[in-house]
Protein backbone atom coordinates (compact mmCIF):
# COMPACT_ATOMS: atom_id res chain seq x y z
CA UNK A 1 0.00 0.00 0.00
CA UNK A 2 3.00 2.31 -0.09
CA UNK A 3 2.88 4.95 -2.82
CA UNK A 4 6.54 4.49 -3.74
CA UNK A 5 8.98 1.58 -3.50
CA UNK A 6 10.85 3.04 -0.53
CA UNK A 7 7.75 3.77 1.49
CA UNK A 8 8.12 7.55 1.42
CA UNK A 9 5.43 9.84 0.16
CA UNK A 10 6.33 12.17 -2.65
CA UNK A 11 6.08 15.84 -1.84
CA UNK A 12 5.57 18.30 -4.64
CA UNK A 13 6.42 21.89 -3.95
CA UNK A 14 4.85 24.65 -5.95
CA UNK A 15 7.42 26.64 -7.86
CA UNK A 16 7.80 30.15 -6.49
CA UNK A 17 7.43 32.93 -8.98
CA UNK A 18 7.98 36.65 -8.93
CA UNK A 19 4.58 38.31 -8.64
CA UNK A 20 6.01 41.55 -10.02
CA UNK A 21 7.25 39.84 -13.21
CA UNK A 22 3.91 38.07 -13.62
CA UNK A 23 1.89 41.27 -13.19
CA UNK A 24 3.80 44.33 -14.37
CA UNK A 25 1.04 46.66 -13.14
CA UNK A 26 2.00 46.03 -9.48
CA UNK A 27 4.05 49.00 -8.30
CA UNK A 28 6.96 48.78 -5.86
CA UNK A 29 6.77 52.12 -4.08
CA UNK A 30 7.90 53.32 -0.67
CA UNK A 31 4.69 55.36 -0.33
CA UNK A 32 2.64 52.15 -0.17
CA UNK A 33 3.64 50.50 3.14
CA UNK A 34 0.73 48.03 3.04
CA UNK A 35 2.22 46.23 0.05
CA UNK A 36 5.75 46.36 1.49
CA UNK A 37 4.65 44.84 4.82
CA UNK A 38 4.19 41.46 3.13
CA UNK A 39 7.97 41.38 2.57
CA UNK A 40 8.87 42.09 6.21
CA UNK A 41 8.74 39.68 9.15
CA UNK A 42 6.90 40.60 12.33
CA UNK A 43 10.30 41.41 13.85
CA UNK A 44 11.02 43.93 11.09
CA UNK A 45 13.51 41.93 9.01
CA UNK A 46 13.31 41.87 5.22
CA UNK A 47 12.27 38.45 3.92
CA UNK A 48 14.93 36.91 1.61
CA UNK A 49 14.07 36.13 -1.99
CA UNK A 50 14.43 32.37 -1.56
CA UNK A 51 11.43 32.56 0.77
CA UNK A 52 9.42 35.34 -0.88
CA UNK A 53 9.97 33.97 -4.40
CA UNK A 54 10.80 37.29 -6.05
CA UNK A 55 13.46 37.61 -8.73
CA UNK A 56 16.78 39.33 -7.99
CA UNK A 57 15.82 42.53 -9.82
CA UNK A 58 12.59 43.01 -7.91
CA UNK A 59 14.08 41.90 -4.59
CA UNK A 60 16.62 44.72 -4.88
CA UNK A 61 13.81 47.16 -5.65
CA UNK A 62 11.74 45.91 -2.69
CA UNK A 63 14.73 46.23 -0.36
CA UNK A 64 15.48 49.74 -1.59
CA UNK A 65 11.86 50.87 -1.13
CA UNK A 66 11.60 49.29 2.34
CA UNK A 67 14.72 51.16 3.41
CA UNK A 68 13.31 54.41 2.01
CA UNK A 69 10.02 53.86 3.84
CA UNK A 70 11.90 53.18 7.07
CA UNK A 71 13.90 56.39 6.68
CA UNK A 72 10.77 58.55 6.53
CA UNK A 73 9.03 56.49 9.26
CA UNK A 74 6.37 54.78 7.15
CA UNK A 75 7.70 51.37 8.24
CA UNK A 76 9.35 50.42 11.54
CA UNK A 77 12.99 49.41 11.76
CA UNK A 78 12.17 46.90 14.50
CA UNK A 79 9.00 44.90 15.08
CA UNK A 80 7.00 44.75 18.27
CA UNK A 81 8.63 42.87 21.18
CA UNK A 82 7.26 39.53 22.44
CA UNK A 83 5.58 40.19 25.80
UniProtKB/Swiss-Prot annotation:
Matches recorded under PANTHER family: 30S RIBOSOMAL PROTEIN S18 (PTHR13479), SMALL RIBOSOMAL SUBUNIT PROTEIN BS18M (PTHR13479:SF40)
One GO term (biological process): translation
Keywords: Ribonucleoprotein, Ribosomal protein, RNA-binding, rRNA-binding
GO cellular-component term (any): cytosolic small ribosomal subunit
Gene designation: rpsR
Record-level Gene Ontology MF annotations: small ribosomal subunit rRNA binding; structural constituent of ribosome
Family: Belongs to the bacterial ribosomal protein bS18 family.
The name this protein goes by in its record: Small ribosomal subunit protein bS18
Role summary: Binds as a heterodimer with protein bS6 to the central domain of the 16S rRNA, where it helps stabilize the platform of the 30S subunit.
Subunit record text: Part of the 30S ribosomal subunit. Forms a tight heterodimer with protein bS6.
Amino acid sequence: MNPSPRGKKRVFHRRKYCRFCADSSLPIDYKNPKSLKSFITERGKIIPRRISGTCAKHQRAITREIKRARTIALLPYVGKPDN
